[in-house]
């Protein structure tokens, strides 16, 4: 379904102006513990396409066990990257519908500019 979405957006000429993000909130432990592999927030992946993202580009890697990233991108950095791509001011305080304040990506977050052409 993901590939079909990307292909459809590309064929319609909409991919360059649409950022598609496929992300999870955690990875899986490198070791099997008998019941599965459990949640593992230290090393996981996300996929970005369109919206100026370089095609076929891979950013970062992990050690051979898949336990630790060599160039970690925090969840806040990912949020800042998405916000930057969408043209949002990263320093501005926004408020949710219930009044909760938040900053896109957080105060120390940095967009990963290397992802973009």
Residue map of PLM features:
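Ligand-binding pockets and gating/stacking loops
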Residues: 1-117
């Amino acid at each position: 379904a993901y590939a079909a979405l990307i292909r459809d957006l590309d064929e319609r000429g909409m991919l360059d102006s649409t950022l598609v993000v496929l992300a999870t909130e955690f990875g899986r432990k490198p070791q099997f513990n008998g019941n599965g592999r459990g949640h593992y927030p230290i090393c996981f992946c996300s996929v970005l396409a369109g919206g100026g993202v370089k095609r076929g580009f891979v950013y970062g890697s992990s050690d051979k066990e898949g336990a630790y990233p060599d160039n970690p991108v925090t969840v806040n950095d990912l949020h800042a990257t998405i916000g930057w791509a969408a043209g949002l001011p990263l320093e501005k305080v926004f408020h949710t519908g219930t009044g909760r304040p938040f900053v896109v990506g957080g105060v120390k977050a940095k967009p990963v500019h290397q992802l973009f052409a």
